[in-house]
């Protein structure tokens, strides 16, 4: 029942965003990110959201399949350690970094509401430090925003989702930092169609047809 109702809400949000009703964020800023010497990216556009949803291969593929998404990039977000993020360091645990996908979108084609509803459709918000078969702090779920407009939307959708579950472990907060993942992680499932993915193919196809 939970997933069925989420799908219905998602379809409604996508339809409304196409009519220019649900889009909650301003028009796109053409410049997206700037990369500092450390490898950390600094956000310079409004129409972006950072989604931690378990293994980033699947979340990246899911977001890329949604019409209106301009780009999805795998990386590591909101670390608390002093080290820069890379796969080996993050997998050791204790860094605070989450496998996260940076999603840039065109608000004239898809709303942030719709992207968040797609996100909550495929994750399990009731478990901590785990999604699917993947266990570890790097697989903790989270939604990280970079603007006041996105904050309002994220908190509104999160409140709805919290009301539908007895437990809710999804981190909700501002983006602190983001390091792009290694090149071999980018577009991983495009390069390896039979590679591991914790999101069922049927759900991928559902959103690609919206």
What is each PLM-predicted segment?
Residues 1-8:
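Bacterial N-terminal signal peptides that target proteins for export
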């Amino acid at each position: 029942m939970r997933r069925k109702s989420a799908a219905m809400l998602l379809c409604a949000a996508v339809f409304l965003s196409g009519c220019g009703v649900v889009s909650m964020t301003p028009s796109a800023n053409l410049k997206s990110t700037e990369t500092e010497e450390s490898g950390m990216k600094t956000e310079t556009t409004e129409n972006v959201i950072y989604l931690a949803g378990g293994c980033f291969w699947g979340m990246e593929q899911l977001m890329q399949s949604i019409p209106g998404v301009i780009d999805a990039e795998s990386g590591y977000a909101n670390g608390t350690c002093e080290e820069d993020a890379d796969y080996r360091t993050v997998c050791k645990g204790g860094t605070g970094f989450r496998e996260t996908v940076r999603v840039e979108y065109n608000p004239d084609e898809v709303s942030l509401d719709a992207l968040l509803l797609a996100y909550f459709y495929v994750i399990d918000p009731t478990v901590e430090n785990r999604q699917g078969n993947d266990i570890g702090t790097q697989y903790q779920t989270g939604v990280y925003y970079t603007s006041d407009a996105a904050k309002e939307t994220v908190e509104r959708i999160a409140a709805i989702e919290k009301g539908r579950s007895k437990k809710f472990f999804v981190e909700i907060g501002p983006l602190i930092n983001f390091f792009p993942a290694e090149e071999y992680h980018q577009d991983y499932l495009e390069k390896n169609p039979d590679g591991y993915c914790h999101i069922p193919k049927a759900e991928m196809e559902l959103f690609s047809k919206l």
